[in-house]
Amino acid sequence: MVCCLTVFFVVVPLFNRGQDEDTEAVIYPLFGQQYSDMITDTNHVALLDQKMEFPLPMKDLPDAFHIEKRYYDDMTDGIDAGDSFQCELLNDSDEPVAYIKVTNQKKNTVQSPDDMVITYIVASSFQTQDKQYAVPFVIRDGIGIGSTAEEVKQIFPDADIPENDNYSVVNVDSGIQKITLEFVDRTVYKMAVSSY
């Protein structure tokens, strides 16, 4: 059963995400629902207008977000310690705004995603009301989707951002967070945050 869950939750979503890579490399206008304050520490992120601890226990997920009910239904046999699944994170209109990895960090088998922790978030753009928008997704000091290479270098001076490449991928560390920034024309169009 666990083997089947692994194929369904991990391999299939990863395959589907790979098909989207070429179509996502576009700079869209930022969606208006944005977090208004500045994050000053390295253990929080903000997605849309919601500030969240990261890594984030699923039980603390803001009411503005949810995952499909089937992930709860499919876990009745349990997920072992250390195992994980990946899925879309939906807003209150059931629109996918991010993609997450949910991990069982307990030492025992759990039967509900609410007993697990979000250890990875990646976001780029989403469609709402027939328009495509960049997802407001930021870490400390306002760095996130829509940030320029120059803004990133001010906060992460060691970031190795190529000067003349139209597309680049840069990894930086921020406390317990590992950040992957994908640039198009030296602007962040996609960001992933994972925990060690």
Regions found by a protein language model. Name each.
Residues N166-S174:
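Extracytosolic low-complexity repeat regions of secreted or lipid-anchored proteins
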